[in-house]
Amino acid sequence: FAAVSVDCSEYPKPACTLEYRPLCGSDSKTYANKCNFCNAVVESNGTLTLSHFGKC
C-alpha cells in the first residue's frame, strides 16, 4: 500500500484556479484541486494529509 502524497512546497498561493481535480483530505473534505488542498495543508500546519485522489 503506497502512501499518496502531494508536493505542497510551492504553496500557499494567494489565488487558486477554478480547475476541478478533486482530492480527498484526511479531514474527509473534498478539495476542488491541488491548490485549494495545499493551501489548507499549510493552514493546518501540516496536520492535514491527502486521503486519496478523487471526491471523498
Swiss-Prot record:
**Where do the coiled-coil regions begin and end?**
none
InterPro entries in the record, alphabetically? Bifunctional_prot_inhibitor, Kazal_dom, Kazal_dom_sf, Prot_inh_Kazal-m
Q: Which residues are glycosylated?
A: 45
Q: Where is the signal peptide?
A: none
Short name of one Pfam family:
Kazal_1
Q: Which domain of life is it from?
A: Eukaryota
Q: Which Gene Ontology cellular component annotation is one that this UniProt entry carries? A: extracellular region
GO molecular function terms listed in the Swiss-Prot or TrEMBL record: serine-type endopeptidase inhibitor activity
Tell me what this protein is called: Ovomucoid
Which species is listed as the source? Oreortyx pictus (Mountain quail)
What does the record give as the organism's lineage?
Eukaryota, Metazoa, Chordata, Craniata, Vertebrata
